[in-house]
Amino acid sequence: YWVKNVPAYQLVFLTNGKGDDYDKLQISIENRNLLFSKERMVYVESMVLFEKGKETWWYGMEERYIESLQLSFKDEKYLKKQLCLCTMIDMGEIGCFNRNQLENILNEIKDEYQIVGTPRGIIVGRGYEGENFQRIMEIQIPIALKH
């Protein structure tokens, strides 16, 4: 585990899911045109918010880049800058991901830290190692120290 200040993000909604089961993508035409235009290249993170009983998937972009590129998304969600406890998890093969690893982490840290926001994950890598397809996610849990 490590602790870091995670910058502010703007999020563009993609879909709901539970584990590796996802609903249909729901990105608006306006947001799709901004993100995937021929005039600019926009770098976004594939981000998930671990809400009660479900996951919501988003494209996330640091606030500073949105300001620099003068982008304006429709119906975006804002995540403020936060102190987060972070770790990496292996999401496994496609079809194997569930939130059990997150629940284990939350149980492990509950005596030391107060969770002050919605835990989230960012897919930081995916690819094959030998014959196994791996997806690596950075887990970010907004925290405050318990007194």
Predicted regions and their residues:
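A solvent-exposed interaction/effector surface
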Residues: 1-147
